[in-house]
Amino acid sequence: MDELQPQRPAILVAGDHMIDAYYRCEASRLTPEAPLPVLKVLSSYTMPGGAGNVANNVHHLLGGVETFVTLYGEGSSSIKRRYLVDHHLAARVDNDYIAKPITPKVFTDTLESNPTIRVVLFSDYGKGALEEIEELINICIDKNIRCIVDPYATHWFEYRHATAIKCNDREYNASTWIGPHQAVIKTKGDAGIELIRNGEVTHYPTRPAQVVDVTGAGDTVLAALGVCLTRLDCTVEEAISYANRAAGVAVSKLGTYAVRKDEVPDA
């Protein structure tokens, strides 16, 4: 891993790397074994998924400037294979692998090797990389580094010291513990984003957009929050506004998509 240029504030993306594989197919007949279509693959491509998609969005939102570091769990990446017919999802096949966790020592060494890191984005998909996330968050706090968690667990006690938790409606409703002073950034699809903090809810409506595919939009939100928060004067509210606009671009694209800096509309 290359060290960052010392003058640039940087982002660390840590978590579960996955691979999103897409197969464009045609379905012209049913199989004789069951009333199911036979899919003929016409073309295919892959994109980084999970924490990899967060990092890819960070890269593009920064305009291609390499001011971020990635830290993934060691081992094979889980693969999500999506089969599309006429731009519609016909089937999905997952191969899940459990990675070795990122240890506090490796995490600390990464931060100390890259002292310009100001924000850490934890992308937790439950594939093993962030088994020790509570201790990793505490390391961020000790070093005065902002950190945002995209959660997998439903019990959020281990996330209680994070700067914020970024979740969707389903994850929020499934949570079994939320700290009374925890900042929660909840995405609500085409209804925008809510900031829940100290018992108050602030709603940030999204701009009207044609929703084509919501795949990976949460990763775009997490990346955009991190990019904005590398500025010491950036508030959580300003970061949410920027993330909302970036997500509006992501959902207008088919499949996993990394939003470019020049695609994000002005406030």
Predicted regions and their residues:
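Ribokinase/PfkB-type carbohydrate-kinase core domain
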Residues: 1-30, 34, 40-214, 230-236, ...
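Short basic (Lys/Arg) and small-residue
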Residues: 218
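Flexible, glycine-rich loop/tail regions that form catalytic "lids" or insertion modules at the edges
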Residues: 224-225, 230
